[in-house]
């Protein structure tokens, strides 16, 4: 896809057209917000009920939770109160201890979405990460993920650790951590990688999933709406690349490809959605893309910054 091509996103037929063509930050971001708001409206009109959701944090930094809490339109409170019924999210749940995990177990007989961030440590039968204590017994991430995933209507991995292993599974990987799809040995999982995942992507994916079902995904299980185009194609510094004018050090305004930027090989929505509903994103802050949404991050994308040109 060339840099001047419009990105096309499949949306339902009732939106008057089968393709929604977007070529600007505003139009793409507007579509994502529409998806979340459409899900909320369906609940209000009684077309759909609020689906239960369990969000489990296993082994990782949980930057995805901080990212989610920074969502602005819709914000996380509106999302949780209007179109998903969040049963459990350890970082923000009021309940603690056995009471909290009991609610998780009670939800397993209902229709629910399972969201998970972090990788699963396998060493020593999973004892490197425990997520709860129940009836006097420690519940490992291995056990919890396997238990919750079994009856879930949909599974979404939030973040690169959950999706591909990410930093948690990076060398030397002393805990023998693996991604959720690898642990469960399933290929029907929706992956939303990112370090962290942008809340716009999470909100949009949840909105689409609750209103229309499984979105169109690429060969890695990532929704094409957010991972269907190279960062390079929408980068504000692309003109410098085309002119073969490259930055020599961090802080220069030119293309950072010679400094190790992975934008030309990384498929993500970053230049358009950006972060915190602002113009904030890595390249905009003079930091090369490190390819954090890909399956080889971080070991396969190092060094993140290099000097000395090509």
Language-model segments: which ranges?
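Intrinsically disordered, low-complexity sequence elements enriched in Ser/Thr/Gly/Pro
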Residues: 1-2, 26
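Secretory targeting signals
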Residues: 2-12
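Iron-sulfur-associated redox domains of electron-transfer enzymes in respiratory
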Residues: 10, 14, 18, 22-267, ...
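Long, low-complexity C-terminal extensions of enzymes
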Residues: 262-308
């Amino acid at each position: 896809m060339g840099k001047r091509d419009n990105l096309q996103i499949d949306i339902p037929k009732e939106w008057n057209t089968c393709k929604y063509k977007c070529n600007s930050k505003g139009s793409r971001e507007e579509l994502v917000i529409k998806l979340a708001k459409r899900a909320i409206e369906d609940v209000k009109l009684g077309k759909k009920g609020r689906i239960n959701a369990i969000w489990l944090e296993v082994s990782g930094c949980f930057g995805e939770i901080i990212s989610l809490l920074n969502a602005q339109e819709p914000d996380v409170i509106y999302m949780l109160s209007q179109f998903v019924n969040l049963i459990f999210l350890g970082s923000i749940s009021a309940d603690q201890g056995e009471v909290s995990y009991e609610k998780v177990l009670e939800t397993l007989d209902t229709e629910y979405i399972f969201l998970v961030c972090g990788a699963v440590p396998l060493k020593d039968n999973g004892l490197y990460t425990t997520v709860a204590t129940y009836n006097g017994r420690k519940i490992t991430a291995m056990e919890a993920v396997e238990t919750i995933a079994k009856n879930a209507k949909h599974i979404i991995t939030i973040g690169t650790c959950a999706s591909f292993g990410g930093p948690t599974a990076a060398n030397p990987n002393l805990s023998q951590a693996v991604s959720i799809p690898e642990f469960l040995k399933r290929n029907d999982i929706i992956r939303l990688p990112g370090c962290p995942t942008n809340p716009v992507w999470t909100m949009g994916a949840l909105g689409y999933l609750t209103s229309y079902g499984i979105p169109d995904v690429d060969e890695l299980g990532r929704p094409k709406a957010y991972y269907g185009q190279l960062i390079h194609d929408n980068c504000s510094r692309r003109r410098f690349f085309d002119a073969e004018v490259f930055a020599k050090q961090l802080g220069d305004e030119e293309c950072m490809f010679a400094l190790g930027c992975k934008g030309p090989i990384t498929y993500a929505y970053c230049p358009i959605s950006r972060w915190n509903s602002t113009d904030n994103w890595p390249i905009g802050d003079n930091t090369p893309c490190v390819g954090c949404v890909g399956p080889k991050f971080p070991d396969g994308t190092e060094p993140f910054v290099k000097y000395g040109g090509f």
